[in-house]
Amino acid sequence: MSAAEEVDGLGVVRPHYGSVLDNERLTAEEMDERRRQNVAYEYLCHLEEAKRWMEACLGEDLPPTTELEEGLRNGVYLAKLGNFFSPKVVSLKKIYDREQTRYKATGLHFRHTDNVIQWLNAMDEIGLPKIFYPETTDIYDRKNMPRCIYCIHALSLYLFKLGLAPQIQDLYGKVDFTEEEINNMKIELEKYGIQMPAFSKIGGILANELSVDEAALHAAVIAINEAIDRRVAADTFTALKNPNAMLVNLEEGLAPTYQDVLYQAKQDKMTNAKNRTENSDRERDVYEELLTQAEIQGNVNKVNTSSALANISLALEQGCAVTLLKALQSLALGLRGLQTQNSDWYMKQLQSDLQQKRQSGQTDPLQKEEVQAGVDAANSAAQQYQRRLAAVAAINAAIQKGIAEKTVLELMNPEAQLPQVYPFAADLYQKELATLQQQSPEHSLTHPELTVAVEMLSSVALINRALESGDMTTVWKQLSSSVTGLTNIEEENCQRYLDELMKLKAQAHAENNAFITWNDIQACVDHVNLVVHEEHERILAIGLINEALDEGDAQKTLQALQIPAAKLEGVLAEVAQHYQDTLIRAKREKAQETQDESAVLWLDEIQGGIWQSNKDTQEAQRFALGISAINEAVDSGDVGRTLSALRSPDVGLYGVIPECGETYQSDLAEAKKKRLAAGDNNSKWVKHWVKGGYHYYHNLETQAGGWAEPPDFVQNSVQLSREEIQSSISGVTAAYNREQLWLANEGLITKLQACCRGYLVRQEFRSRMNFLKKQIPAITCIQSQWRGYKQKKAYQDRLAYLHSHKDEVVKIQSLARMHQARKRYRDRLQYFRDHINDIIKIQAFIRANKARDDYKTLINAEDPPMIVVRKFVHLLDQSDQDFQEELDLMKMREEVITLIRSNQQLENDLNLMDIKIGLLVKNKITLQDVVSHSKKLTKKNKEQLSDMMMINKQKGGLKALSKEKREKLEAYQHLFYLLQTNPTYLAKLIFQMPQNKSTKFMDSVIFTLYNYASNQREEYLLLRLFQTALQEEIKSKVDQIQEIVTGNPTVIKMVVSFNRGARGQNALRQILAPVVKEIMDDKSLNIKTDPVDIYKSWVNQMESQTGEASKLPYDVTPEQALSHEEVKTRLDNSIRNMRAVTDKFLSAIVSSVDKIPYGMRFIAKVLKDSLHEKFPDAGEDELLKIIGNLLYYRYMNPAIVAPDAFDIIDLSAGGQLTTDQRRNLGSIAKMLQHAASNKMFLGDNAHLSIINEYLSQSYQKFRRFFQVACDVPELQDKFNVDEYSDLVTLTKPVIYISIGEIINTHTLLLDHQDAIAPEHNDPIHELLDDLGEVPTIESLIGESCGNSNDPNKEALAKTEVSLTLTNKFDVPGDENAEMDARTILLNTKRLIVDVIRFQPGETLTEILETPATNEQEAEHQRAMQRRAIRDAKTPDKMKKSKPMKEDNNLSLQEKKEKIQTGLKKLTELGTVDPKNRYQELINDIAKDIRNQRRYRQRRKAELVKLQQTYSALNSKATFYGEQVDYYKSYIKTCLDNLASKGKVSKKPREMKGKKSKKISLKYTAARLHEKGVLLEIEDLQANQFKNVIFEIGPTEEVGDFEVKAKFMGVQMETFMLHYQDLLQLQYEGVAVMKLFDRAKVNVNLLIFLLNKKFYGK
C-alpha cells in the first residue's frame, strides 16, 4: 500500500500528504509544513511519470527517481529523446559522451550543454511552443530542474497529440516514496526557492498556443467533453468534427471506438483530478477534469493507429499484398519509406514478423514500431536484392572479359552477398567460373550457382594455400567440410589424402600451375580410395597364401600366389615346390624371432620369398650344368678345358690356380677311374645339395632339372660331385703352396740366423758393463781422498804467509774503510744535485695535496668552512677570454634568431608562391571544363557560370586547394608537431584511457607519429615520450616499488616491445646467438634438475635395456627419488653442466653492455632515477633488482627461452627446437633469472641449494652489469639536439598517418583536453580551437557522404596522408628578470665575494664585524681599479648594470654595511638564517665556484652548437633563396605561357621583327552586366549602364591588366588589376570584389573573361 494512500482498519481512505482529517486540528505552521510536503510528493510523482515515459520512448533504464534530476544534467538522455522524435535534427553520432563514460569518470563538461541545445532544437523542429522551454543553465547548472520536468510533460502530451509517443501516466497517489525521500526533495525545493510550474494547465496552454480563436476552441473542446459524457457516439463524432476543435484524421467508421476510448480517458482524468483536489487548496483549472484538445487528438490518433494495425493484421491473414499496401498507407500510422513496388516484400517480411511474435507467445497484433521496422527491413531486403542482381550481372561480365583481378573484385563486392573470396586465388576463380559459365545453357551464372561455386572454390583456394604453408590441419578441415562438396571422403584415409595432395601440389608447381583445381582434388580422393580398396583385397589374398602354406600343398600354394589381387610378380609354376619350401621356412623363422607361433608372412616377405626362390632355381641350374661340364672335361683329357670348367663361378670352387692345371686333370681323372672301376649304373639323374640345404635334381641327358624328386630316382655312380672335386683341388693346391713358400722366404731365414748370433755377442758386452758399474763407489772414494790432500796443503801455506806480514795488512784495511765512507758521502751529495727537480716536485706535491684536500672539502662538505671558500673565490673572476666567449655567444645567438626569423619569412613566401602556382594550375584545369560548356550558356543559365568556376574548389579532401582546407591541413600539422615535440600531452593521454585502448593507441598512432624512430630526430623525441610517460606512470600509478616487477606497467611493456622488435633484434642476436647455437649443437647436453624426472628417465632406461619391468615404483616423491645413488649422480652431472653453460651465457651478457640499444639503457636509467626519487629509502640493491627485471627478465629472458620466436637463431624450413633443447634453455634462463634477482633455491628446490653460492657470485656480476648499463649520456648529449634543431633542417619532418588515426587522435584530445592541459593558456587549447569539431572521414578524404554502415568506410579510414609538421609558435625570446629575492641574494653574494677575498676570517659574521686594515683596503682598491679598466673594454651589451658599477666604487667597510642590509632583507624573506652565521650564503658561493667550470664547458659547447646551427641556417637560407627565385621564374613562365596562348598572340605578325600591338577590350557596363561580370555600380541606375565603358588592356608586366572607366566618353579612373590577386581571392572564397571602390564584379566570371579573351582558354 502506498505512502500517499493508506486504508485504516475501518476501511476509510486516509488522506495524502498535506490533508487534514476531520478530527485533526493543526496550527498554521503545521499546515504550511504539510503543504510543502505535498508539493514535494507531487513533484516526485511528476519525476516518476517523466522517468517512466522516457524509458518507454528510449527503451532503456533511467536513474532512480530521486537521482533523475542529476542524471538529466549532462543532457544525454534528453538528446536521445530528441533523436527519438526528431532523428533528422539529433543524430546519435552528435550526442556528446553518449555512453556517459566521461561523465562517470570526471563529471560534467561544458560540452554536455551541446546535448541540451540539440534537444531544444528538436522540440523547435516539431513545433512545441517555446513557452515550455527551459534555459540551458536551468538543466546544466540545476538552477530550475522542475522547469525541465514541466517541459518533458508538455512534450509528452504534444507528441501524444501528434501520434509520435505514448501518453504519459498520472501516478499521483499510485507510487511510494519514503519520508526521507520526500523530506530531501522538500529541502531541495526550498534551497533553490523554485516556484513549481502548473503541470495541470499544460493542456490548456497548448490549446491557447494554437493560432485560432481561443474562445471558439475552448467552447468546442467543452462541447466534445459534454458529448462524451452523454455517451452517444454519433453526437460525440459530430462534436469532434467541429472545425473550431482543430481535430484531424477523423474517421466516421471509428466513432463508437472514439466514444469508448475518450470516455475512459475522461473518467481516468476525473479520478486523478478528484484525488488531487481533495488534498490541495490550490486554485483548480477547468482542464483538470476535462480532456484537452491535445488529449482528444492523441486519443483519436491512438484509435486510428489501433484500427490501422488491425487492418494490417487482417491483410496479413488474407495474404493480399494490395490490401496490405493500402493499410500501410494509412495516415494514422505515418509510416516512412513506403514503396509501391515493394508490396510483396512487405507481405513476406510482416508475415514473418507476425509469425515470430506468435511463436514467442504474444497474441496481440504488430505494433506501429514493429510495422515500421518491418517496412524498413523489407525495403532494405528489396534494395539488397536489386543490388545483388546488378552485382551478379557485373560478375558474369567480368568473367567473360577474362581479367582475373576484375573478376575477384566483383566477387568481393558486398552487394553480391557471396561467401568469402580470397584475392590470392584470382586465377583459380577466373578459370573455374569461366568453365562453369560456358557449360551453362544461358552462358550466365545465377546467384545460387555463384554461391555454391564460390564457396567450393574458396575452400579449394584455402586448401592450396594450406598445402603451400604445410598446414595439414587446415587442409583436412577443408577437405572434410561439406562446403567443399567433395564426395567419398573417408576419415581413416586422412593422411593418405594429405600425402597425395602434397605430391599433386608439387607436380602442379613443376608444371607452372599455381593451383590444383576441385576436379584435381576429387580425382586425388578417388585415387586414394581405390588404392586403399586394392590394399584391402591384397590383405585378403595374403591370408589365403598363409593358409595354403600351412596345408603343405605346393599346388594350392601356387594357386594362392597366382591370385590377381595379391599382385605378386615372378610366380612360376615349375618352382612351386621351392616356393612352398622357402616360404614355409621363412614363416617358421619369423615365428621363432617373434616367439609367436601364429605369425604370418606379409606381402613383402612373400614377394621376397618368390624372388629368392626364382634366384635359387637359376643358381641351382647353372651349378648343375657347371658340375656336368667338369666331368665331361675330365673325361676328354683336355687340361685347358678342365681348368676353364673348374674356374667357372657357377660351381663356386675355390683355390684353383692355373699352375696346377695338369695336376688337377690327372688327380680328377684318377678319381673318376676309381668310380668307374666300382661300376657304372648308367643313371641319367644327378642330385645336388645346394645352398639353403635343398636338393636339386639334374637330368644329364636333357640338361634340365627341378626341385621335386623324379619318380624312380637313382643317383649316377660315375659322376664326381662338387665335394669330391673340391677335395681334390684343395689337396693339389696346398702341396703347391708349401713348395712355393720355402722358395720365396730364403732371405728371411738367413737374416734370422744373423740375429741370433748378434744376440749372443751383446749379451757378453752387457755382462762386462755390469761389473764396472758395481765398482763405482770404490773408484770415487780413491779419487776424493787424493783431491782433499792437495787442497789442505795449499791453505796451510797461505795462512803462514799472512802471519808473517801482519802490520801491512792492518794499514791496507784502514785505507779501504776511509775510501768507502768518503765515497758514500760524495755519492749522496751528488744524488741530491742530480735530483733537485724531483725534490721541487715533491714539495709541490705536498702543497698541492693540501690544496686538493681543501678542494675536496669545498666539493664534498655539506657546510664548507669560510677559510676553504676564501681560497677559491678567485675562480669566480671573469677573465678576458670569458668576456670574449660571452660576447661571441650573445652575438651568435642574436644572429641565429635573426636568421631563423628570416628563414621563417622565406618559408612563408615559399608557401604563398606554392599556393599561387597551384592556383595557376588549378585555374587551367577549371577553365577547361568552363570553356567546354561556355558555348551552351543562355541568358537563363548564365548565373551558373560562377558555380562552374568554383566546382573544383568543392572537390578534394584535406589537401584540397582551398583556404578552408589549407587552414585545416595546417592546423593538423601544427597539432601533430606540438604532440611530437612536447611529450607531456601524449604521456598524460595514455593514462587517461583504459589499458587495452591505450595499448592500441600506442601501437597505431604514437609509433606512426614518430615514424617508428626511423631517424635520430624521431628516436630522440620518442625516447623523450617514453621518459616522460614512465615518470608520469611511476608518479601517479606506482604506490609500492615492487609493483614495477609484479605488475605490467604500460610504458615498460611498450619500451621492451619496441626495443625487442626490428630495432633491437639484431642486438639480441649478436649477444645471444653464439651461445644459444652452441647449446643447440651439443646433442649430448641434457639438463634435468627435477629429481622425479631424473628418476623416471632412469627407470625407463633400465627397462629399455633389460627388456623387463622394473621392480622400482614409478610414482615417487623428490625425497624418495634422491635416496637412489644413481639419481644423485645424474643430478650432480646436470647441475655441473647447467652451471657451465649458464656461465657462458652470463659472460656473453655482461660483456656486451655496449651492444644493448641506447634506448633500452636510457629507459633503465630513467626507471632507476624515478624510483629513487619517489622511494628515497629504497636501497641500491633493490633498485638494481628492478633494473635487472627490465634488462634481463623482460628484455633478454624470452629470447633465451624461445630463440626461434625472436629470430635469435635460423632454423630450416619445418625445423623446430627439440624438447630437450627447450628444456635446457628454460633451465638456463631460470638460473639467470635467479642470479639477476639474487634469488636462492629454497623449499621445493632445496636439492639445488648447492648452487646458491654460485648464484650469489653471479648476482654480483649482474649488479655491476646493471650499474654500467644505467651509465649513459643524456638524450641531448647523445643526439646533439636543442631548440634550434628543427629550424636548421632543409626538409621538415613528415609523418604518414591514416585518416582514421587523425580522427581518433582528435577525438581523444577533445575528450581529455582538460586532463592533459589543465592550464587555459596552454598552446594545445588554441590548436584544438583552430580545428573545431571532429571532422568526418568523408570530409577529410573528399568523398561524398555515404551510408554510415557503408562497408567501404573502414577501408576509407585506412587511407594514409602525409603531414609536413610545422611549429605554429615562435622561438621564445629572453625575458628580463624582476628585482626579487633572487636579485637581492645575487647582489649580496657578489659583495661577500669581494670582501672575503681581501679580509680573512673564520666566519662571515666575524669578517663583517672586524674592521679592515689599511693594507686590506689598499689591496681592495687596487683590485677594483683593475676591474674598472677591464670593464671599460667590455662591449655595451655586456656591460654591468649601473648598481653593479656603483658597488665597485665602494670601500670594504661600505660593502660590509651593504651586505648587512641585504642580509636583513634576506632574513625577513626567510632565505638565510643568522643563527648558523649565514652558512647558506657560503654554501651558495661554494656551489657557484663548483659550477663555474661546468658553466664554461657548457658555454663552449653551446657556442660550437650555435655556430653549427648558424652554418646550417645559412645553408637553409641559400636553399630557400634558390627556391624563391625558381618559383618566381616558374610563375613568370606560367603567366608568359598563358599570354603566349592568348588571342592577341594568335594574330599573324605583319612583318618579321615587329612587335605585335597589344589589343585592349572594350565593354559597356550593360554588356558586362548581361554577362554577369558586373553586378552593380553604386549611385548609378541600371538603365545608365549603357553610358559606362570599361577598357581592359594588358600591361608590359605579364599578369597585370589596366582597367579604364569612361562615363559618356569621359575618362574617369584607372585601376590596376593583378591576375594573381584574382586567383588569391578565388582561393579565399571571395565571390565579389570592388573596382574603383564603386563597381562590384563577380570574381569568378571576371577570371573567366580574362582567360577567354587574353589567354585563349
Swiss-Prot record:
Domain IQ: 745-774, 775-804, 805-834, 835-864
PROSITE patterns xrefs: CH, IQ, RAS_GTPASE_ACTIV_1, RAS_GTPASE_ACTIV_2, WW_DOMAIN_1
The keyword Acetylation appears for this protein: yes
Cystine pairs: none
Residue ranges of every copy of the Calponin-homology (CH) domain listed in the record: 44-159
Modified residues (Phosphoserine): S2, S330, S1441
Record PTM N-acetylserine, positions in chain: S2
Chain spans, region C1: 956-1274
SMART domains, per database record: CH, IQ, RasGAP
UniProt domain Ras-GAP: residue ranges: 1020-1269
UniProt-annotated stretches for the region C2: 1276-1657
Tissue expression: Expressed in the kidney (at protein level).
Pfam families (UniProt xref): CH, IQ, RasGAP, RasGAP_C
Keywords: Acetylation, Calmodulin-binding, Cell membrane, Cytoplasm, Membrane, Nucleus, Phosphoprotein, Repeat
Gene Ontology CC: apical plasma membrane; axon; basolateral plasma membrane; cell leading edge; cell-cell junction; cortical actin cytoskeleton; cytoplasm; cytoplasmic ribonucleoprotein granule
Record PTM Phosphotyrosine, positions in chain: Y172
Tagged with keyword Membrane: yes
One Gene Ontology term of the molecular function aspect: calcium ion binding
UniProt free text on domains: Regions C1 and C2 can either interact with nucleotide-free CDC42, or interact together.
Described function: Plays a crucial role in regulating the dynamics and assembly of the actin cytoskeleton. Recruited to the cell cortex by interaction with ILK which allows it to cooperate with its effector DIAPH1 to locally stabilize microtubules and allow stable insertion of caveolae into the plasma membrane. Binds to activated CDC42 but does not stimulate its GTPase activity. Associates with calmodulin. May promote neurite outgrowth. May play a possible role in cell cycle regulation by contributing to cell cycle progression after DNA replication arrest.
PANTHER family: RAS GTPASE-ACTIVATING PROTEIN WITH IQ MOTIF (PTHR14149), RAS GTPASE-ACTIVATING-LIKE PROTEIN IQGAP1 (PTHR14149:SF15)
Name used for this protein in its record: Ras GTPase-activating-like protein IQGAP1
